[in-house]
Amino acid sequence: MTVIVLAALLAGAAAAAAAVMLVGDDDGRAPEIAATGASEPLSGPEVRFSGSDVTTGEAVGLGKLEGKPVVVTVWASWCAACPEQAEPLRRFVAANDRVAVLAVDTQEDAEAARAFLTANDLGLPTIADEDGHIAAKLGVRELPTTLFLTSDHQVASMWEGPAGIGRLKSAALAAARAG
């Protein structure tokens, strides 16, 4: 009996480890595993949030992006993996005008967000989420996290860990087609 229970526990741990290894693995293929480890993309209620851009002070948020699919990237300057997402985001923004990109810098102030944007040459509209409220509302468990929203701002999929250019393109295309 003990052997069977131990074998079952080990099998469950191995399956969980395999799912975790898939999160953040970006080989350029279409997303197959959502952040939950499920094979189906996430879907849910319409996402809404807004704030002031850390660079310009202008109001930004999903309300200003009605009718357009949106990539929302959630990061922080203290996150070791977050700079890995900068180059793919720059390339994605430069090659794309049909999908909006909005950044949320979480659990730090606007000054830290501006420094990160400057250091990583990112010209993205960015909201400072100092208390982590927006990240919590979005279900963020790990940084960076990227959400792909349909044109009616439903969550089409979510990716935990740095997303490469292939992942950004394929998931954004899927979100655009879904809504």
Give residue ranges: language-model regions.
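A short beta-strand-turn-helix
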Residues: P41-S43, R48-V70
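Thiol/disulfide oxidoreductase modules built on the thioredoxin-like
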Residues: A115-L122, E130-G179
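Soluble periplasmic/extracytoplasmic beta-strand elements of cell-envelope proteins
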Residues: T73, A103-D105, L147, S157-M158
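Conserved N-terminal glycine/acidic-rich loop preference
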Residues: L65-P69, A113, L122-L124
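Structural microenvironment flanking redox-active thiols in thiol-disulfide oxidoreductases
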Residues: P83-N120, E130-K137
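Short active-site neighborhood of thiol/selenol oxidoreductases, capturing the structured segment around
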Residues: V60-P83, L89, V101
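N-terminal targeting signals for export/organelle localization
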Residues: M1-R48, G179
